[in-house]
Amino acid sequence: KTSYGWVSSLAIDPVEKKPLYHFYPGTKALSLGTLGCNLGCQFCQNWHISRALDFDQLCEQASPERIVEAAKKTRSASVAFTYNEPIVSAEYVIDVARACREQGLKTIAVTAGYIHPSAREEFFSCMDAVNVDLKSFSKSFYKKFCFVDIEPVLETLIYLKTKTNCWLEITTLIIPGVNDS
């Protein structure tokens, strides 16, 4: 069994909850999560889906067309790939995003930005807006708490700003005493 098309979470949210405060403010986003993450953050807020292995218990199948129908039915202006890392379901996310665009829906990725350079162009070319969750500006923080290097994340931020037309906002979850200095 593959993870393609398995949706763990589906909700209608204000776009500001992504959080995007300057991209279609005041509109609704159909928020969609799958399973998995390519980071191992010790402080993960959605660990129950980022580390889940049981597709049958946590997920439902949803074709790209079904997601578009749900967004239109709920009068959502956009579909946001959120709750877990959308890059780990890139093939599915890209297919859903393309189906959304065909129907005039905007697409949003809420991501940690940890993506190989060879995959960036195809993935982000399907997105209208991106919120990158920058965990910290510290190499040691990323190694100790996320188990990855910060460099690919910083490269993704530069790529998004200089090579795409994506609206970009950055979020950092403040962990008192850990990444707040």
Give residue spans per PLM region.
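N-terminal [4Fe-4S]-dependent radical SAM core
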Residues: K1-T34, W47-R51
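Short, functionally important structural connectors and interaction interfaces within domains
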Residues: I12-E16, A29, D54, A80, ...
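A generic secondary-structure signal marking the coil-to-beta-strand transition
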Residues: K28-L30, G40, A77
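Glycine-rich His-Gly loop
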Residues: T34-G36, Y83
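Cys/His-coordinated zinc-binding microdomains
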Residues: N38, Q45
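Generic domain-boundary/flexible-linker signal
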Residues: F43, A52-F55, A90
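A short alpha->loop->secondary-structure connector
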Residues: I49-E60, E102
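Conserved AdoMet/S-adenosylmethionine-binding subsite of the radical SAM
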Residues: Q61-S181
